[in-house]
């Protein structure tokens, strides 16, 4: 499975380690301080997103450009942000949760299965 990481802080690095342990290919990562990285990032089967609100606009552009599915645990999203994710869900598979413990459980199960 090809994985793109959106948000490369503590959580992003942990997800990278788990993905690599499972034999998944991490095709790249981007973060808020460098939003232009989303513009040139390669497509993936799924984007694992633990970034921040500031990354949402470039992230949505990346997902639409590459037709990559999204699993996100980003918190602090506004109603318009959630509406944008819901709209994206009409085009691509999208899973979002703001509860980190639930999000981690989902990621662990995904990585285990």
Describe these PLM feature segments.
Residues 1-3:
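Extreme N-terminal starter segment of soluble prokaryotic enzymes
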Residues 40-58, 68-74:
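Rossmann-like NAD(P)-binding element
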